[in-house]
Every structure is written in C-alpha cells, then in structure tokens.
Regions:
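Surface-exposed extracellular loop regions of Gram-negative outer-membrane beta-barrel proteins
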Residues: 27, 32-46, 147-151, 193-197, ...
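Membrane-proximal, glycine/serine-rich, low-complexity loop/turn segments characteristic
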Residues: 1-149, 164-196, 230-240, 306, ...
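Flexible loop/turn segments at secondary-structure boundaries
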Residues: 198-200, 246-249, 291-294, 331-334, ...
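Outer membrane beta-barrel strand-and-loop segments of large Gram-negative receptors
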Residues: 222-224, 269, 354, 358, ...
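C-terminal beta-barrel architecture of Gram-negative outer-membrane proteins
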Residues: 61, 437-444, 455-501, 505-506, ...
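Outer-membrane beta-barrel translocator domains and adjoining extracellular loop/strand segments
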Residues: 84-100, 145-160, 175, 201-210, ...
Length: 578
C-alpha cells in the first residue's frame, strides 16, 4: 500500500462477501485498480567544480520513454584556466666535434586554458531484452586559444627569454548505430558501427634561437564496425566475429613546416573462440587473424597478424583459484608518427614522422593466484609482455648539429610486472582497508642501445561506510617506467574524500595532494648517447586541489528496459604530429 502512487489509482472496490476465487476464510477484499503508466522520464545533472582553481565539468541530461522507445539528450561542458604549471629543463648536446653544448630552459610564466562542449541525442528501441536498436548522433567542439609559455633560456654564455604560443580548435560529429538480437534462447547477434568526422585547426609559434611558426588544417574521416555472433551450446559457448576499421586523414602543414599528408588505413580482423567449464576448470580458447592495408603519399604496406588467445582458470577450493591468460595481437603506431612531416621542437631539436613504420607483434602472459572469503580479498599477479619489432625512439645527429627524433621498427621491448593486492574488512560492510604494491621492470633492446630499468610502486586506501556518509582516503607513490630512451615519472597522488547521499542528491568533497603547494607532476630523463635531457614539471593548481561534486537525478513514470550496450567503438585521433 505504501508503494502506491495515489495519482495512479483509478478505482477502489470494497467486496464484503468475496467468492471462492479469493480463497477460504477471507472476510472482505479491498480491490485497488490502477492504470499502467505508458510513459516516463528521467532528468538529472552532474557537476564538478574545483574550489581552488578555475576548473570544472558539468553535465545535464534528460530521457523520455513511451512504450518500447526512449529518447535521450545530454550536454557536457568542461573547461579550465590555469597559470601554475611550470617546468625546468637542462640539456646536454654532444656535438660532432665531441664538445658538449648545454642549454637550460626554465618556465617563467604560463597560461593554459581550454573549453570543451559535447551534445548527444540518442534513440533506443527495446523489445524487452530480445531486440535492442539504438542510434545516437553526437557533436563535440573543443577550443584551446592563445596558450603561451615564457621561458628563460641559458644557451652557453647567452641568456634571453623565448615565448611559445599555441592554439587548437576542433569539432567532431559522430553517428553511432547499435543492434542486438536474441535470435533464440541460446543464440544472439550484436553489431555496432560508428562514423566520425574530425576537423582540426592548430597554430604553433616558438622563437627559441629564431622564430618558427606553422599552422595545421586537418580533416579526418573514419568508420568503425563490428559484429559478433554467439551460440551457447551444451559443452561450451561458441562466438565468432569480425571487426573493420577505415581511417582517412588529410593534414596540411603550412608555414615553416610545409607538408600535405594523405593517409588511408584499413584494418580487418576476424576471430572465433569457445569458452566453457570442465569440472573446476573454466577455459577460453580462440584465434583470430588481422590484415592491415596502409598507404600514404606513395608509401604502402600490407601486414598480417595471427591472434591466438587462451585463458584458463582453476578453482582450487572454495576461496582459492589460479588463472593464466595468453594472447598475441598487433600494435599500430600512433598515426601522427607515421606522417612525413618534420617539426622543429626548439633551437636544437626536431621531430620527424616515419611513413614506413609498421605494426608490432605483442605477446602477453598473465598468471594470477587469488583468494577470497567474507572479509579478505587478495591476489598475486605476474604479467610479462614482449613486443617484437616495435616502434622505438631513434635520434639522429646531423652534420650541422641538429638532433632529430623519429621512430623506427627495432628489435624488442619487454615489460615485467609483479604485484600483490589485499583488501580486508576491519568492520564488515563498514570499514575496509586495501593495499597493493610490486615492481615493474622494463627492457628496451634497440639497434644501437639497450636500456633496462626497475621501479617499485605501492598504493593504499581506507574506506568507511557510515550510513549515508562515505569517507575515503587514498595514497600512491606515482608511476615510473622507461620506454625507448625516455625514463619517466608521473607524480605521486593522495586524496581524502567525503560523500553524502540525500534523497535524489549526491554530494562529495575531495582534497587532492593536501599540504602540497608545488606539486611535482612529472619528471623525465632522455638517455640518448648524444643528447641528455632532464625535465621536471610542477603544478601549483594540482596541489591542495579542493573539488566539489553535486549530482541530482529524478525519475517518474515507467522505466525503459534497455539492454546494456555490449560493443563500444570510438575514434578521437586527428593524426597531427606535435
């Protein structure tokens, strides 16, 4: 009775002498007749704003359904404006005569700002969960105007100021069509296709040594499509599918960098797999083949890759299990690095694309032991990855002492990760602590260098559930790795957060990197034999960052039974080298 909405009641009958249809021993019946709602709606918003800097993200959305159809519309706005990010860099260049030339670059003043808009209109038709058809049209607009960095340059005995300016503007409409059909209780078909257009205009200026300015007018068109058939047979489940992607890029570089890049990239991938269970053993066995056809300004290649995959999970007892996964796949280079353009980075360095880059073969192994009971969740995980003929950093020193960075296919990159995790409920469903840690080992085998590096990582958290309140704390020591000739560190992170739920509202307040007014965001070392660089980046706005999140949701009427989308395709790469 308490769950009834009085607005839905059409008539109430009081039956004083009910018949046998209501059962024996029934003295009277109250018959409440309601009308079924054929439509409904949902509206909501999700807003996040930094209270210590100009940064925010906000979304509003609405859904309306009637019968088997639902329309939804959402709009997202995000942006930032910061002045607190600065870096300092020391560089040592070994010249052709064997002497060393030193340059220091220190940021004196910076301004970074950007704004992004995205709107999305979606129509969904669902016949319970047997058939789902969904189509959506979205548009994104991004603008980052008039950003600049003023640097103090110490070039040998010479000291001066240099200014770097850049601007970036893009818009991107996309059409997404999704279909799911439960053909029979055991068979299903899923398909998804996404078409995207990206238009980008960028401008860059830097006057270290001498003025250097260029603009880029970029146009990108892509089609991503995938279809999967699944049949749940008695001994196992069989699935097969095909994935196709096409991307056309036309980027025109004007000014001091002059080039017209036209790229066509086609990739076709087909696979089949079975998964099932034999007593305590769950298994997945499959294989696929991919074919890549690539052309750019007279450069072309065809590339085939075999994709075997195996996954085994053995339940040792009620709480302990062991799993192993193996797979091989292709790894395509970032599209921007396959262009034939050459861009000046500073007075001594250039970045050059390589149209002859080919994909690599990646082989992955993962072994895991896990244990779970009512209060403890723990696992030990080992991961090893081998990249054969990967795209690796290559530096060339010219006769006039210019240093050119590019990528070429070289010998091998390997990565080893070993980690352990444990989460424990100190008070069941009330207070939980968790921690993980391990090591990460990188191996880089180039044609003319070998670099290896070992790093350690850890993270810990504590969460308290106090009715409608939730309190959280998290800390880690950052991320360290070495790829090619670049050793990098992403800053340590810590945050405390409190959240509260009240009716249709959710509130949360977070404090990131507390008591740190000059947060170290990153550090990078370049280890080339002829070029050593050490760069450290600091961010004032990321230290002592206080953010407030408010979300609200209201639903009325009938709810639309739409199945979860099983395939999600998306393209955002404009292929512009920077």
């Amino acid at each position: 009775m308490l769950a009834l909405d009085p607005k839905n009641i059409t008539k109430i009958d009081f039956i004083n002498n009910p018949g046998v249809r209501y059962g024996d021993g029934i003295a009277y019946v109250v018959d409440i007749i309601t009308h079924r709602k054929e439509s409904g709606y949902t509206v909501g918003t999700d807003l996040t704003s930094a209270l210590t800097t100009l940064q925010g993200d906000g979304m509003v959305y609405g859904k309306w359904n009637r019968g088997k159809s639902e329309w939804s519309l959402s709009y997202d706005l995000s942006g930032y404006r910061t002045k607190g990010s600065k870096s300092k860099q020391s560089a040592e260049y070994t010249l052709t005569d064997g002497s060393i030339h030193r340059i220091e670059r220190n940021d004196m003043e910076t301004l970074r700002k950007a704004i992004a808009h995205e709107a999305k209109l979606t129509y969904n038709w669902a016949d319970s969960t047997a058939t789902v058809f969904q189509t959506s049209f979205s548009g994104a607009f991004n603008n980052a105007p008039d950003n600049y960095i003023i640097k103090d340059i110490k070039d040998g005995a010479r000291q001066y100021q240099a200014t770097s300016c850049d601007a970036d503007k893009s818009y991107s409409p996309a059409l997404d069509v999704y279909f799911f059909r439960q053909i029979s209780p055991r068979q299903s078909l899923t398909a998804n296709a996404v078409g995207t257009y990206i238009s980008t205009q960028t401008g860059s200026f830097y006057n270290e040594g001498s003025p250097y300015k260029y603009n880029v007018d970029g146009k990108t068109t892509s089609l991503l499509a995938e279809a999967i058939y699944e049949n749940r047979l008695k001994p196992f489940t069989f699935s097969t599918g095909v994935n196709y992607s096409y991307k056309y890029i036309k980027n025109g570089y004007l000014g001091d960098a002059s080039s017209l890049t036209k790229t066509n990239n086609n990739r076709l991938y087909g696979f089949a797999e079975i998964k099932g269970m034999l007593r305590q053993l769950r298994y997945t066995l499959g294989a696929g083949v991919s074919y890549i056809h690539y052309t750019q300004n007279g450069h072309r290649f065809n590339f085939w890759t075999f994709h075997p995959k195996a996954s085994l999970t053995y339940q040792i007892n009620n709480g302990l299990q062991m799993s192993y996964t193996y797979q091989m796949q292709d790894k395509v280079s970032r599209i921007a690095m396959t262009s034939d353009v050459m861009i000046r980075t500073n007075s001594m360095e250039w970045t050059k694309g390589n149209p002859d880059l080919k994909p690599s073969h990646d082989m992955e192994h993962r072994l895991q032991f896990s244990y779970n009971n009512n209060r403890l969740q723990a696992f030990v995980d080992g991961y090893f990855k081998q990249c054969f003929k990967p795209n690796m950093a290559h530096y060339e020193r010219t006769q006039d002492n210019q240093f050119v960075y590019t990528q070429i296919n070289q010998k091998e990159i390997d990565a080893l990760s070993v980690m352990a995790y444990a989460g424990y409920w100190l008070l069941p469903e009330k207070l939980q602590i968790a921690a993980n840690g391990g090591l990460y080992r990188c191996f880089n085998y180039s044609n003319d260098y070998t670099h290896c590096y070992t790093s350690w990582f850890y993270a810990a958290s504590i969460t308290a559930y106090l009715g409608r309140f939730t309190l959280q704390g998290y800390v880690d020591n950052g991320n360290r790795f070495l790829e090619g000739e670049s050793k990098s560190y992403n800053g340590a992170y810590s945050v405390v957060k409190a959240s509260h739920a009240w009716r249709n509202w959710q509130f949360s307040l977070s404090w990131a990197n507390p008591l740190n007014n000059n947060y170290k965001a990153y550090e990078n070392e370049l280890l080339n034999r002829n070029l050593y660089k050490h760069t450290i980046g600091y961010s004032k706005w990321m230290g002592n960052l206080v953010s407030l999140n408010i979300s609200w949701r209201l639903s009325r009427g009938s709810k639309h039974n739409s199945a979860e989308k099983r395939i999600n395709l998306r393209d955002t790469d404009n292929g512009i080298i920077k």
